[in-house]
Amino acid sequence: MKIVESILNRSEEVVYRELQSIASDNNMKVFAKPRLSDVIQKDNTFLTQREFDFYTRSHCDFVVTDDGFRPVMIIEFDGPLHQSDEKQQERDQIKNELCKRAELGMLRINDRHVTKLYRGMTVLRWIVEVTELEKAFNEAQENGQIPWDEGCEAAASRS
């Protein structure tokens, strides 16, 4: 037995570095390869045997947390195998469903999300930052800092 050269392949390493940069700019943290059961806590929710086995044995590619280490979203890097392998697609569906039940956002990306630019930033950065802006906006509305009709007025004025 020997130690692996790296726990991340080259593509995952590129994603990790981009996520680290995004996280540092947004007061968040990034973790690579945590177990799904460390990110999503099982409650009384019924899981089939297949779902339970998957839940206890699988990992996430990346988890983004807030500064208090609470998971904000899972980022899955999908290489070509995810498009062509039926078994992999089944596993992806189970993970998607478990995240949905836990109300934890999941973003499935490929290499274009870290190589293509949109408005001067990677598509991955744009998606994460827009997601965080939406959360901050909704929080501000809930706290009474932004009127509830603010979002509606802006949309109506553009029509």
Region annotations inferred by a language model:
Residues 29-32, 108:
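A structural signal for short, well-ordered beta-strand segments and their strand-loop junctions
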Residues 4, 97, 101-159:
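Basic, glycine-rich
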Residues 21-22, 98:
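Alpha-helical scaffold elements within enzyme catalytic domains, especially in hydrolases
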Residues 60-63, 68-121:
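Basic, amphipathic alpha-helical patches used to engage nucleic acids or provide basic targeting signals
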Residues 1-4, 79-82, 130:
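A short, structure-level motif marking secondary-structure boundaries and short turns
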Residues 7, 31-70:
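Active-site metal-binding core of divalent-cation-utilizing nuclease and nuclease-like domains
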